Amino acid sequence: MLKTILSALSLLMLSYSTTSFGDEESSGKTEGLKVKITRQIETVDIKHEGKTISIQRNQNTKNLINPAFAKTSRKCPPFCIQPLILAPGVETIGERKMLEYLQQVSSGNDNVLVIDSRSRPWVVRGTIPGTINIPFKTLSKNTEENITDILEDEFGVTRGDSLLNFTYAKTLVLFCNGLWCGQAPTNIKS
């Protein structure tokens, strides 16, 4: 059975910080946050590189978006708005679902992989904790053999006699910079 590839085409507008922890793990609840993720969820704690990271929304209600993401008009192509349904079998998800997948990865679910599809210069500026980086050009510009290695080593695909077997493939969640960004869609289409 072919697994559905999921795409979160907008970078989470959340902040994160390393929380201190001792014998007990952070509960994901911080008393009195005014800007919550949902009415019931103030923060989401995940493991990233051996540390607990608390993801929460920026508490400054006067905060403005980072200028790197503030342009409302970009030349198309290449910065064209992506369709809501990228391809058959591909589901576009929102930020809450992205957080659920990050929690699954954090709790040790090896069947889910959250991928930052952006190029290295974007990742260096910041990424979502708990993700791995597979830049969009890695799949679109590589040889068939290299792509097969990625499918096997990262995505859980197995090689049969002459076909690839997707029976145990992981659920992939890909993201990039937003609606105008084609990096995750390029990875998905590859």
Describe the predicted segments one by one.
Residues 21-125:
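Flexible, polar/low-complexity N-terminal or interdomain linker segments that lie immediately upstream
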